[in-house]
Amino acid sequence: MKLTPMMQQYMDIKSKYKDAILLFRLGDFYEAFFEDAEIVSKTLDLVLTHRQDAPMAGVPYHALNTYLKKLVQFGYKVAICDQVEDPSTAKGLVKREVTRIVTPGTVLEDDLLDQNSNNYLVAICRKSEYSVAGVDISTGESFVVSFKDFQSMIDFLGSVKVSQVLCEPDLRQDLEKNLADIMIESLADWHLDDALLEKDIAEVFKVSDIDHLELGSNLKVFGALVRYLRYTLMSPCTLVKPPRIIRDQMYVFLDPATIEHLSLVGGEKGKNLFDVLNHTKTSMGSRLLKNWILQPLRDLYEINKRLDKVQAFVEDSILLNEIREYLQAVRDIQRIANRINYGKASVKDLVALRSTLQVCPYIKEVLLTNEAFPEAAMVDCLHDICEILNDAIKEEPSSVIGEGKVIKEGYDEQLDQLRELVYHSQEFLNNFEQRERDRTGIPNLRVGYNSVFGYYIEITKSHLSKIPPNYVRKQTLVNAERFITDELKEFEQKMLTAKENLERREKEIYDEICASLSSKVGLIIELAEFLAQIDVLSTLAYVAIRYGYTKPSFSNDGKLLLRNSRHPVVERLVDTFVPNDLEMDRTKNFIILTGPNMSGKSTFIRQVALVSIMAQMGSFVPADEAILPVFDRIFAKMGIRDDIASGKSTFLIEMNEVAKIVYQATENSLILLDEVGRGTSTFDGISIAWAVSEYLQNQISCKCIFATHFTELTELAKMYDGIVNKTVQVIEEKNQVIFLHRVVDGIADRSYGIEVAGIAGLPGEIIQRAREVLDVIANKSELEDKLRVISSEKLKKLKKKKVHPNQAQLW
């Protein structure tokens, strides 16, 4: 098939971007052809048409982002091919080039992003360790971190909002098995080339030397990342802030399973910790709050700094209310700054930046009334930028640049003249027409326009004798003649170029403004980070007041004391919540928690973890009193689940999770276990639960709460001084079970499973038969005798072995 020049142009460009969907600008549409068209048609539910027998599907250019969002969400890489010259002045085929490659990790536009989450592009390389570098180009944030083992790296990535991963080819298969629903792409050789690596990174940060960045062994992976960004953005990749160096001792370790089991983020709306705490006023604050939840601090000094500022807001209601009122006017200037940095800022962005800068002096002023915020004195409110935007941008500008409706009148004389010409032309024509009528004495003289002859003066034949000498005949009609004058011809010539010049001049001015702002991007980002922190701190104070939270304190002797503690999420979902106490220390650090179904065991152990996380992120906590140790890691293994897609059974998944905990926990960790050993036979389950408990107590000596229906495990309290038995109270009245949800010392005498089955609505005959069967098998004395003769001394002699986490599934 012989191709037209345009289709040949398409094929030539497509050959360079075989791994991407190519959206090819044709007039007012972006078109996809061949296999790309079939993907676009199916994904976007668009009609598939044909051009020269080639499948074709297109989207309107003005609605590109709407369709682009869906393609990116489905994990496609999209190459945007634009017309890079004006079709009206092009000689022959319009020149076209790919101007940008859009992937899940290289999105800048607001309507393609989640306002409450970061959007990290991550690169991974392996030498002696796994080196990881991440960049969120929408906010300008970046980080580097290293891991000794694969599983620790996977766990970290599960706690970061990663949307795309770049990796060395030999890592791809393992990553695809462990990172579901994330786009994974192999790095090319040129991404990893050592040549000019330091120079490329220096260009990103606009510095001459990169030693101060402290990239160390992460130099290569960070270089690969910025080279990929430069390739996809089709422009220099620039980052204002140096990457954050993440070290092991900075944050509490929370693996993906723990994040899921504790419902920290995600899941059903209103039923996770983030949704309960998120009363932020800004998108920047919302993202920061989520990061604080997922990365609680381990540095006690930094924790207390946050808590003291929250307390200052709690104790100063006037300050709190004023700050939250002002923050309502603050927009997402963090992402706006980065769009300015990459030349992608819209008129809407500049208006949002202006409204934020207008309120910043008031935020600074009110913060300085409280001694808890001395850093506010150093905040640059960027008055010069605000002044530029006030002078240049209309109060309610058009979103379209080039119509003369963005730049204020009086800002640029040339633009004002062009605007006057374009938008007041009718006034000129009316005045001209009346003036000519008066001058010629022709009452029905009319000025008109058509696309063939342009502007003209029309005079009926009955008045032709009155035509002045300067009138030049242009067209003859049946009953009239049309004329032109030098003045009208000059006006016409101006009008032909005025709209074009208006569009060009307003765009020039807009680009000049954005260029002047680009030198201030670093300062805008600093201001954005400050405002985001104030938003989160004031929000935590607002939540503390609203929900009755208390400022926690921290012990250095391992003491954990909670008085009337509550589950922050569950208490928002029920009419009445029963608070509970808890006391642990280094001598009593392991609790076996028994109790019936529906009694609240799982809620209790979750709330202990949530209170600890809230405290270490710098939040007040739902309790009357809270004294806590600083935990280095928090693990939660709650319930059991299948993973049919990977072929893993309930029990295997459970054992994998427990093995990971055993190998990664330290004496400063908090472990919460719920129903370990339930996925296999009773004897096997009890034996495993028993052995795990002994190992955690004897070898790790961390704080652990183990909720179980295996009452046999309560025998451990007789064998080990550090283990304590607790239960959740239940009473029976008139053949009804009443759950008190109160945790007390003791052991549950039964599970009340049959009673719960009755509450669930099982037929009466099934309930009755269950009682009969229970009477037959209730005698457990033989099993208990067998367990008591287990030689605990053998287990105590076990030494904690250094086993690679990848071997966990063999445990």
Swiss-Prot record:
Keywords: ATP-binding, DNA damage, DNA repair, DNA-binding, Nucleotide-binding. InterPro entries: DNA_mismatch_repair_MutS, DNA_mismatch_repair_MutS-lik_N, DNA_mismatch_repair_MutS/MSH, DNA_mismatch_repair_MutS_C, DNA_mismatch_repair_MutS_clamp, DNA_mismatch_repair_MutS_core, DNA_mismatch_repair_MutS_N, DNA_mismatch_repair_MutS_sf. Pfam families: MutS_I (PF01624), MutS_II (PF05188), MutS_III (PF05192), MutS_IV (PF05190), MutS_V (PF00488). One of its GO terms (biological process) is mismatch repair. One of its GO terms (cellular component) is cytosol. The keyword Transmembrane helix does not apply. The keyword Aminoacyl-tRNA synthetase does not apply. HAMAP family: MutS (MF_00096). Belongs to the DNA mismatch repair MutS family. This is DNA mismatch repair protein MutS. The lineage of its organism: Bacteria, Thermotogati, Thermotogota, Thermotogae, Thermotogales.
